Amino acid sequence: MKINILNKLARFFLIFGFLLAYNANAEIGGDFTLKDYNNNKYNLYSSSKEKIIFFGFLNCPDICPATLSEVSNLLKKLRGLSKRIDPIFITVDPERDKPDLMKNYLSFFDERIIGLTGSQDQIEKVANQYHVYYSYQDKGKKDNYTV
């Protein structure tokens, strides 16, 4: 039994190590400037705080609210340490996720979560920097489309 577990662990770390080495040169992230839900410019590198960055959209039925709840719980568990963190929510649906709606929505989870938006091109550029993929279905149906 112990040997079986050790075998599985060895395989896991071998595969994990390979994936890390394979992706070692892949650059993910980088600086950006978007607008927050108060219409102020937010530059990622303007603060020395650690960042938790989450891409999502307000009409997301399950994964986005569940993840925002996890971020909120993490901030509560960190207590005073949470002052050293900027939790950031970047919308991938800037047409529908207007700043006032985003501010109201995020306040249900935690007032410290910073909601960011921009033009469709700006959001796409930042998403590409972070290797985030999203798409729209039925975009021609005004506000009745899926992300």
Give the location of each predicted region.
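Short active-site neighborhood of thiol/selenol oxidoreductases, capturing the structured segment around
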Residues: 43-71
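Conserved helix-turn-beta segment immediately C-terminal to the redox Cys motif
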Residues: 50, 66-90
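Short, internal strand/loop/helix patches
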Residues: 103-147
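Extracytoplasmic
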Residues: 27-29, 47-50, 82-87, 97, ...
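Thiol-based oxidoreductase modules, predominantly thioredoxin-like and allied folds used
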Residues: 83-97, 112-121
